[in-house]
Amino acid sequence: FRFIPGIYHNLPDTLRRIPFPGNANGCHDNLVASTEVMFARTGGREDIRLPFSMIGTPPPVLTPDAFLRMLTGLLQTATHLPAHEIAYFANRLLVFLTSCDRRRLEVWEHTPWWRFVRAASMSPDYQRLLAIGLTRNIVATKAEIASTRTVATCAEAFVFNVLGRGADGQPDRVLNLPTNEAWIDPWVAHLRSLGVAFRVGWSVRDLRLAGGRIAEAVVTDPQGARQSVVADHFVQAMPVEHARRTWNVAVRAADPQLARCDKLATDWMTGIQFYLTEPTPIIHGHINHIDSPWSLTSVGQAQYWKSRDVPADYGDGTVADCLSVDISEWDKPGILYGKTAKQCTREEIAQEVWAQMKGGLNDTGEHVLLDAKLHSWFLDPAVGGLGTPHPTNDEQLLIHPTGTWFNRPASRTAIPNLFLAGDYVAVDIDLATMEGANASARQAVNALLDASGSGAGRCTVTPLYRAPEFAALKRHDETRYRLGLPNAFDLG
């Protein structure tokens, strides 16, 4: 599924620029808001089902006290945790929000989220909901190693989104059609109309340096034949695990930041879709299967496709819904076979994911997911070799252990005609997302235009929202940081 929250600004701007028949705002008009979120619990505990949208009347001025009261109220409603744990977590977010940029970069970037929120001394539910749940299911990074700067930046953005501050829209938005129909196909058509040529099935093998510049890219066609691509400028928009294979010794020597990319870590976050013979809109939003060993997140998609009759428009006429699931944990044993996802066959993964979802949705007497209603499933073909000693994943996700920021490259490289774009490039959102990739591409275009001396207009790169009320507190924290003092709100 595609999750496009209101904290995004650069990607939504691109969506507005892609024409779509009947839409005044292009593909952006294909975004629809979800209204709920659920934390599915196991062991007979009731699931936590909450409204999830911008609040009606946010405070006009956000003081630290107003922030703590608002966040405490939200957490009391959402988590049912002990009062002292809620108070502590709210305080930790306030510490981050009022931390100066230097403290964020030099301290919190090196601090694991688990330690920042003192998860080791808190209840199992605190650990599951606020420490692990905010990291493994969202950024596919273990809480014990995830950068506090990355996790808290994301949390800060969502808090302001819920408050209606600086948002492009509601905090949870999805597409009103399958992704290809709502976005990709119109985008491809638009780019082709502008003269873009796509070469599907081709691979970049090497970038060759001559005279301090990239002279050619060596590529292979679908038949494996090597060819040379010569250009004035090269924009490399590839996932980091693929891009760094193309940087030979000479290219790496020309720009040390490329060699540092070898330290960037990736992990598996891969999707599976279950096709059901009856509509199964469990909630109008995403479900975080918070207790699932494989860190599952799911959403029922047909409820958003109002212009489609799913049985008539797709498949063999018997499928009525699509339950789309992200699997974020591939290295822990499941509940059926005692094997990790990487050790399971494709069939075993489907059975295991289905069982884990039922464990959280069917455990309180309701029959939400029924085996008899399962028509078929589809696991991302990017994963291969499952059930063998050598599983592979061609589409891994950048993860964010402490210190990751310092290994992320800029879009502009020391090679004057090579520019980088991708979710691993350093951008304001500091999270491997479609928004981050989009922002990095805008940076790359601007750097290329600068390098070529072009008089063309530059791309707008929009950062995350920052509350102006906290600017003075952050300046005060800058002084405290220079003096070696903790943040004024930091209780330890």
Residue ranges of model-derived segments:
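Amphipathic alpha-helical segments that form well-ordered structural scaffolds
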Residues: 10-17, 112, 116, 182-193, ...
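Rossmann-like nucleotide/phosphate-binding core characteristic of flavoprotein oxidoreductases
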Residues: 68-138, 347, 351-373, 403-406, ...
